[in-house]
Amino acid sequence: MKDRDGSLPEIPSSRGDDIHNIQYMDSADLVLFMAGNQFMVMDDLLSRFRQIYPDVKRIFYETLPPGLELRQILAGGAVFQDKVIDTVPDIYTSVTEEAMKELSVKGRVNEYFIYLHNRLALMVSEGNPCNIKSVKDLGRDDIRISQPGRLEDIAHYITAMYRKAGGDELVRKILEQKKADGTTVFTTVHHRETPQRITRGLADVGPVWATEVVNAQKDGLRVEAVEPGEEFDQRDSVNYFIARLADAPNPGNAEKFLDFIKSPEAQEIYRQHGFVPHFA
């Protein structure tokens, strides 16, 4: 499935940090298309995986939005800068079951399962100078919001959080009225743009994955989290799905990775980065 004009989907040139070990693209022992908001886990995760499976040396992986990775799989490749990446992944992960269902219908995956969960948090500057205490506070006229764009996978969970906290009125206030007023500013890559805006004083708050607050703090950024509360943070809705592609070029190594991702060691690595493990 190429894009509507028949071309391969294009990976924005600015996403170079999400293409890892491209030199192994055609000779990899394992190819992973990981939902992008796991980017902060991958070094620790793959370091431990390689210790357990030292024969899996060359790992090419992407940490792009899973919707873009899905288009890449269905189109048979994607264009990145001056290269065509047409490698079939061994493993694909997504935060929506719809993506897995589409791949299943088209015969690209046979089985998939949930392996992880996440939750939402409100990222604010250290000390919470605007005294933001709840999701409803984002409707205040004086609060500047760094809001993930609708094409980002986190966006519909955030909208659900707003609706749960304040109904359609709060959704309209934040996404329409405050956008028109200039106090809701949308992002393209929220996990980079939101921490930058907050630390530079360009935004007061940004709804993000809780894991992204943990990562920003590990990077030394002076931010903290305001917890929406379990009733609102979507933890029961945010599921991460994983599957081996039916035509995986390295099926044996793909199975090793699937076994590893369920292991207590892998789940603990995710927990340390703020995720909610599925296999307790």
Please place each PLM-identified region on the residue numbering:
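Catalytic metal-binding acidic patch
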Residues: 90
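Exported/periplasmic ABC-transporter solute-binding proteins
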Residues: 1-60, 68-71, 82-87, 96-97, ...
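Glycine/small-residue-rich interface belts in oligomeric ring/scaffold proteins
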Residues: 73-75
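Conserved, well-structured beta-alpha core segment at the onset of a catalytic domain
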Residues: 113
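A short alpha->loop->secondary-structure connector
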Residues: 109-110
